[in-house]
């Protein structure tokens, strides 16, 4: 059950924003306080599974081979990348950047992580897209399905950052639930919890914004 305040504010935002010819993204803008962001321990870097997804198709690439690669393909991932592909992408930075921009998430069998870090870390790292490790105890299909409903919140060294929580045309209660999930996880990751939150705004891509915190 979502908070009435969150639900009311999302309704207010959507009703007060003009209709667009495309499906707008609904984002939250987060402003932190009383944190020294030059200290890595204070930076936010969390991957969060949204209970209601983002309302759009996520592109996922998987570094795998053999049966794992086949299972990933059956699960609907967009690209299966091999050891040879890692080497090729490492040598062709333009192609690597294009793939990094196209895909929302990457998954990799653990034996490829070191090679990926060396060949592609400089491209994937700053984008917050280093692969999610696929350990032997995990099922690749389950990981793909959960990743499709995930967002990553990253502050880097800034006190202000944004994260998408869905699309404007989603059910209002589902959007509110997504927002509360992100904020709950964010507060848990901060040293002083909600006391490190200066403000939180909910906004559409081209519309108005409303203050939640």
UniProtKB/Swiss-Prot annotation:
Key words of the record: Repressor, Ribonucleoprotein, Ribosomal protein, RNA-binding, rRNA-binding, Translation regulation, tRNA-binding
Specify the superkingdom: Archaea
Q: Does the keyword Metal-binding apply?
A: no
Stored InterPro entries: Ribosomal_uL1, Ribosomal_uL1-like, Ribosomal_uL1/biogenesis, Ribosomal_uL1_3-a/b-sand, Ribosomal_uL1_arc, Ribosomal_uL1_CS
Example GO biological process: regulation of translation
MF terms from GO for this chain are: rRNA binding; structural constituent of ribosome; tRNA binding
Question: Quick one: a GO cellular component term?
Answer: large ribosomal subunit
Family indicated by similarity: Belongs to the universal ribosomal protein uL1 family.
What job does the chain carry out?
Binds directly to 23S rRNA. Probably involved in E site tRNA release. Protein L1 is also a translational repressor protein, it controls the translation of its operon by binding to its mRNA.
On assembly, the entry states: Part of the 50S ribosomal subunit.
Query: Under what name is this protein listed?
Result: Large ribosomal subunit protein uL1
Gene symbol?
rpl1
